[in-house]
């Protein structure tokens, strides 16, 4: 039996990995979900800047499409997030975008939302009506190759490297496999720490870096998600161990990382997964779903390395994601969409760890 106030059990979705064809935007319309609010809710794991970008993109899309918009932030608490998603279902919410704190514990509640007929867009882990991911190996390779080039050209092929990983989130593992692959080609590279911070935020990165510096005070390269690498930079500065010739590089294109790159200090690169742009697209898809239209089953946000040379154009794009979405050529430089699903075919929701890199 379903819990009180929740929908009944439904179909299991697609549980075995498949390769989705390209999205067909001209597919015939379906039924509109009945009895659901014209609402968009963002179930947010925490307040890091990357997720603030998601929130902004969703809010802009909701405004453009006439949806009410709500944010439920879980502050890294899986139980709180589960309660928030249950509340979404019991209040007949129309569309949910979620960045799960713990994908396993939240999965049953997300399925209830899917079975209710709502649009559910998930950022990386399943289940979801429409799943957002990045080509994770390529994302890591872009950063790893930038770091390797810097080590070879600026550090004479010698570097002590710290990798701040996300081992608790298996879907991101290919990022770090790619970074290791890029670095292993350089004989003079020593990875002195390969470790997951307890929390994926600046505080977690700073705490981990302080521990690393006790054993290895002279670090040349730090790589990971922007938010934890920014924390590592703070720890380097507070201990007097930051140097202009270091290479700190991250993934996510967070505003603080972009500002650090512009300043010309140790932070040299950020691989952008432009969160306002993919979030705006998810918000548009949510509105399309509620109007009985087809949406993608999966979508890639394509990685791009930010440099001093291209940051201005990138900042203009993320400031106005609506204009990016309306321009097919510009949109295709950021987003790639796969598969088709609508209210009538919602039993085909995604419940496997989808990646466009799976062949």
Give the ranges of each region predicted by the language model.
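A residue-level marker of the well-folded mature domains of exported/periplasmic proteins
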Residues: 1-359
């Amino acid at each position: 039996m379903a819990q009180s106030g929740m929908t009944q059990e439904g179909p299991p979705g697609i549980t075995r990995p498949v390769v989705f064809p390209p999205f067909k935007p001209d597919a015939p319309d379906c039924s509109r979900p009945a009895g659901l609010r014209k609402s968009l809710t963002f179930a947010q794991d925490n307040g890091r800047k990357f997720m603030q970008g998601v929130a902004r993109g969703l809010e802009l899309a909701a405004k453009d499409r006439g949806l009410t918009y709500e944010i439920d932030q879980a502050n890294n608490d899986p139980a709180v997030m589960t309660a928030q998603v249950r509340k979404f279902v019991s209040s007949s919410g129309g569309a949910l975008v979620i960045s799960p704190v713990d994908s396993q514990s939240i999965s049953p509640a997300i399925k209830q939302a899917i079975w209710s007929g709502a649009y559910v867009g998930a950022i990386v882990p399943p289940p979801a009506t429409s799943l957002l991911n990045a080509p994770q190996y390529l994302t890591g390779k872009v950063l790893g190759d930038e770091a390797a080039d810097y080590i070879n050209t600026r550090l004479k092929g010698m570097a002590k490297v710290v990798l701040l990983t996300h081992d608790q989130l298996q879907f991101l593992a290919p990022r770090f496999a790619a970074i290791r692959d890029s670095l292993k080609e350089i004989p003079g590279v020593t990875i002195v720490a390969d470790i997951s911070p307890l929390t994926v935020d600046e505080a977690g990165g700073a705490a981990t870096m302080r521990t690393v510096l006790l054993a290895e005070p002279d670090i040349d390269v730090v790589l990971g998600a922007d938010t934890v690498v920014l924390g590592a930079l703070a720890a380097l500065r507070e201990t007097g161990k930051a140097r202009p010739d270091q290479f700190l590089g991250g993934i996510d294109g967070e505003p603080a990382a972009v500002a650090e790159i512009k300043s010309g200090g140790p932070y040299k690169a950020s691989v952008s997964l432009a969160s306002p742009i993919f979030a705006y697209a998810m918000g548009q898809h949510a509105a399309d779903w509620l109007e009985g239209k087809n949406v993608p089953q999966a979508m890639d946000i394509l990685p791009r390395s930010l440099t001093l040379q291209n940051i201005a154009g990138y900042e203009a794009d993320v400031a106005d994601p609506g204009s990016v979405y309306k321009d097919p050529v510009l949109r295709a430089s950021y987003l790639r969409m796969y598969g088709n699903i609508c209210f009538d075919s919602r039993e085909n929701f995604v419940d496997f760890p989808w990646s466009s890199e799976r062949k």
